[in-house]
Amino acid sequence: MIPAVVLLLLLLVEQAAALGEPQLCYILDAILFLYGIVLTLLYCRLKLQVRKAATASEKSDGIYTGLSTRTQETYETLKHEKPPQ
């Protein structure tokens, strides 16, 4: 039932307004094309920044190679003595 109604509406409707003015379509296509280029450039720039940050963090790991863990406990237990009575 629904596909028949849609087909009937498509046959009764006149030419679409967008098809009557191709210059408008060309302008919108150009805007979308430029938008896609800008987004692609921003995405590539972001990927390069992440890659540079990852290599920089790998190089700085050499600072911590000489450190060892502490042998003394951070918190020591207190020896509580009872007062003499």
From Swiss-Prot:
Residues 1-18 form the signal peptide. It is a single-pass type I membrane protein. Keywords: Cell membrane, Disulfide bond, IgE-binding protein, Immunity, Innate immunity, Membrane, Phosphoprotein, Receptor, Signal, Transmembrane, Transmembrane helix. The modification Phosphoserine is found at residue 68. GO terms for cellular component: external side of plasma membrane; Fc-epsilon receptor I complex; Fc-gamma receptor III complex. Residues 45-85 are cytoplasmic. The modification Phosphothreonine is found at residue 77. The chain crosses the membrane at residues 24-44. GO terms for biological process: antigen processing and presentation of exogenous peptide antigen via MHC class I; antigen processing and presentation of exogenous peptide antigen via MHC class II; cellular response to low-density lipoprotein particle stimulus; defense response to bacterium; Fc receptor mediated stimulatory signaling pathway; Fc-gamma receptor signaling pathway; immunoglobulin mediated immune response; innate immune response. Pfam families: ITAM, TCR_zetazeta. GO terms for molecular function: IgE binding; IgE receptor activity; IgG binding; protein homodimerization activity. It is found in: Cell membrane. Residues 19-23 are extracellular. The modification Phosphotyrosine is found at residues 64, 75. Residues 53-81 form the ITAM domain. PANTHER family: HIGH AFFINITY IMMUNOGLOBULIN EPSILON RECEPTOR GAMMA-SUBUNIT (PTHR16803), HIGH AFFINITY IMMUNOGLOBULIN EPSILON RECEPTOR SUBUNIT GAMMA (PTHR16803:SF0). Belongs to the CD3Z/FCER1G family. Adapter protein containing an immunoreceptor tyrosine-based activation motif (ITAM) that transduces activation signals from various immunoreceptors. As a component of the high-affinity immunoglobulin E (IgE) receptor, mediates allergic inflammatory signaling in mast cells. As a constitutive component of interleukin-3 receptor complex, selectively mediates interleukin 4/IL4 production by basophils priming T-cells toward effector T-helper 2 subset. Associates with pattern recognition receptors CLEC4D and CLEC4E to form a functional signaling complex in myeloid cells. This is High affinity immunoglobulin epsilon receptor subunit gamma. The lineage of its organism: Eukaryota, Metazoa, Chordata, Craniata, Vertebrata.
